[in-house]
């Protein structure tokens, strides 16, 4: 009897004989079915058939699936849109929060309003187009509190700490320090078993770390608390993007759509930040502050908050779309390039100091991230071969998964 094994492609995940999962970048599982030519959840699929009399050498040779130019252009478009919204949002935050600029007295209140706008807009969109955005599965309460809530809290802390750091330090200095996010993303990826530690990755981490240290060295306007806040934000950034990738790309959670995901995390972010605002923001000083001391000023403040919330909604939505169609690693790599763009804009807009030492540090960071990008691309092209992947399931047993590139290598070997 001929068995047919259907593999869903576009993602990469293998299951070892011991049941451990070796995740490349994404966590979607392969599907085994007895049908052919079926579209599964919008993913392309193809069949590799073998009969009980086939040996490894007689298995049909699989062809590689290349990334289409349309996919590349779509990704580049979303990255460009993300750059635009992010740059404007950074300028907005610094202009409003800077100690020597707008000096808005309540950064946490501002973020609470922004998160609330994101929650309301995403809920309205998923409700109005409920037929389109209705998830196939409903996330369990256990997964909600164990996975969604920590992701939301990590995202809220990332944004709150980043904005708080802008009160004390320049956009250029904050951006360079925040460029350390890939280091923490890798560390969390190791912890969550999304990546396997290797000498190459530790070397890349060392290069990026050296670049960050050079940007901090001889900083003429060094503010300790600003530095602490922005580095904690980098830690939270690594955590939240690892968790975001898990939630967006694992089908069992039913959060693959960015609008559904945002409608789940944004309310938690708004509530948590609102509680912090009640505790930490100087509410007693609002009446005498230039943002709230008259009706006209209060109306202007409301408009500023709504404008910032719309910018934040568009930027975060673009981030989630990028992660859902690519990976957290892609977003982080594109994010570091975005930081370079932000630095250039800040130097011209805010006249931030940019020394040759900072320039060298920035170049080293870019080299480190480029090396990481090359490492991931090379790994995806060649396939990460392990001993478990090299063992082929006997035909009489229930189906195991076989990496197609590895089948090519074994087929061509003596």
UniProtKB/Swiss-Prot annotation:
The chain crosses the membrane at residues 72-92, 101-121, 172-192, 197-217, 224-244, 259-279, 303-323, 328-348, 354-374. One of its GO terms (cellular component) is membrane. Pfam families: TPT. Keywords: Membrane, Sugar transport, Transmembrane, Transmembrane helix, Transport. The keyword Transmembrane applies. The keyword Transport applies. Residues 106-216 form the EamA domain. It is a multi-pass membrane protein. It comes from the Eukaryota. It is found in: Membrane. Belongs to the TPT transporter family. TPT (TC 2.A.7.9) subfamily. This is Probable sugar phosphate/phosphate translocator At1g06470. It comes from Arabidopsis thaliana (Mouse-ear cress).
